[in-house]
C-alpha cells in the first residue's frame, strides 16, 4: 500500500533518528485523542509492529470511560492488541503531594516502563508533535529556563520515542480527515485554566498575527537549541567527576575549565546547577571566583549541598554527609 505524504515524512523522521530497530516492536500510548490516534494509524501504515496502551485516570467521569471504549473499538477494528490500566489519580496525587497533572504523568510513564519490560517492547511511542514542542519552549522561556528547557522536547529520550515531532497539529487533523477517522476530544484541552492552554489558544495565535511563520520558526529554534544542548552535555560529561553520582561523596570540580569558558556563568551553572545552585547564587559564586584570591574559603548552601571554594577546585558536599560526620564526632 502506497504511503501518503505524512506517512512518508514520519517514516523518514523515524529512520533519521534511529527509532526503529530491526525486528523490534513498540507500544503506542493511546489516549483516543487526535494525536495518539494518528500516531497509531501512521505507525501501522508504515509497517512498524505496534501494540497500544491506554490509561484511564478517572479524572473526567463518563468522559474517561468513553475514551477507553473508543480505544477498545479502534484497536479491535485495526487488529491491534490493546493493554489497559485504571488509576485512582486523585488518591495518588494526595498521597504524594503532587498536582493532578504530575500524578497522571508519573503513573502513565511508570506503567509504560513496566509494560515495555513485561512484553519486551523496544520502545514507547508518544504523540507529541511540533506544536507541543513550540508550547514547551514558550512555557520554559516564561519560567526562565536555560538551554536544557529551551531545547524543549527531544525526538528520543531513552526508550520514549516521539515520531510526530516533525509534523504539526494541523497535519495530524488533515491526516485523520483524509482517512475519515474520528477521535475523542478532552474537554479540558478547551479550557484556559492551564498555562499551556492559554499559550495554545491565545499567545501563539497572537504571535502568528505578527509573523505567520511563528510556529515553524520557534520549532526551528528549539532544534538548534537541542543541538547546542547536546554539545554542552558532552562538554559537561568530560568535566564530570567520576564520583559525582555517589550520594555521600565530596564532589571536586576544577576551576580552570570554568574560568576558561567563553561564558563562565553558563559553564558554572552546567557544573553545579544539578546540586541546587541557581540564579543569584551562580552570579555570587562567579563574582567570588573572579576575585584576585579566587574566592578561596567562601561557602554557599543549597537545600541539599554545601559548596566551598578551594584554591583550584569547587568542593560540593552533601549536607546529609556533613550531618552524619557531625553525629559521629558528637558520639
Give each language-model segment a name.
Residues 200-218:
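Conserved anion/nucleotide-ligand pocket segment
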Residues 2-202:
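Core alpha/beta nucleotide-donor-binding catalytic domains of modification enzymes
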Residues 2-35, 51-55, 87, 107, ...:
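AMP-forming adenylation/ATP pyrophosphatase catalytic core
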Residues 142, 208, 272-276:
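Hydrophobic/aromatic-lined pockets within catalytic cores
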Amino acid at each position: 500500500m502506497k504511503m501518503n505524504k505524512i506517512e512518508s515524512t514520519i517514516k523518514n523522521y523515524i529512520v533519521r533518528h534511529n527509532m526503529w530497530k530491526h525486528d523490534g516492536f513498540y507500544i503506542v500510548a493511546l489516549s483516543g485523542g487526535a494525536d495518539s490516534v494518528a500516531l497509531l494509524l501512521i505507525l501501522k501504515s508504515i509497517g512498524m509492529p505496534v501494540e497500544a496502551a491506554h490509561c484511564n485516570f478517572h479524572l473526567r467521569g463518563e468522559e474517561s470511560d468513553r475514551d477507553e471504549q473508543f480505544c477498545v473499538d479502534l484497536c479491535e477494528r485495526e487488529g491491534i492488541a490493546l493493554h489497559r490500566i485504571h488509576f485512582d489519580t486523585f488518591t495518588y496525587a494526595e498521597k504524594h503531594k503532587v498536582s493532578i497533572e504530575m500524578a497522571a504523568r508519573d503513573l502513565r510513564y511508570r506503567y509504560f516502563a513496566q509494560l515495555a519490560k513485561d512484553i519486551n517492547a523496544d520502545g514507547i511511542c508518544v504523540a507529541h508533535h511540533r506544536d507541543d514542542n513550540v508550547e514547551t519552549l514558550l512555557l520554559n522561556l516564561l519560567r526562565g529556563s536555560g538551554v536544557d528547557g529551551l531545547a524543549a522536547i527531544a525526538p528520543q529520550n531513552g526508550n520514549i520515542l516521539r515520531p510526530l515531532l516533525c509534523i504539526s497539529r494541523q497535519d495530524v487533523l488533515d491526516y485523520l480527515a483524509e482517512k475519515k477517522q474520528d477521535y475523542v476530544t478532552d474537554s479540558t484541552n478547551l479550557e484556559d485554566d492551564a498555562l499551556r492552554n492559554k499559550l495554545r489558544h491565545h499567545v501563539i495565535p497572537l504571535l502568528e498575527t505578527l509573523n505567520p511563520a511563528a510556529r515553524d520558526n520557534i520549532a526551528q529554534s528549539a532544534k538548534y537549541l537541542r543541538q547546542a544542548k547536546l554539545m554542552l552535555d558532552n562538554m559537561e560529561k568530560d568535566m564530570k567527576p567520576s564520583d559525582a553520582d555517589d550520594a555521600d561523596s565530596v564532589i571536586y570540580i576544577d576551576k580552570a575549565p570554568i574560568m576558561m569558558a567563553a561564558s563562565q556563568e553558563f559553564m558554572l551553572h552546567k557544573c553545579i546547577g544539578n546540586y541546587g545552585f541557581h540564579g543569584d547564587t551562580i552570579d555570587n559564586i562567579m563574582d567570588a571566583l573572579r576575585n584576585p584570591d579566587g574566592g578561596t574559603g567562601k561557602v554557599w548552601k543549597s537545600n541539599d549541598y554545601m559548596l566551598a571554594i578551594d584554591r583550584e577546585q569547587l568542593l560540593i558536599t552533601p549536607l546529609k554527609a556533613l550531618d552524619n560526620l557531625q553525629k559521629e564526632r558528637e558520639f
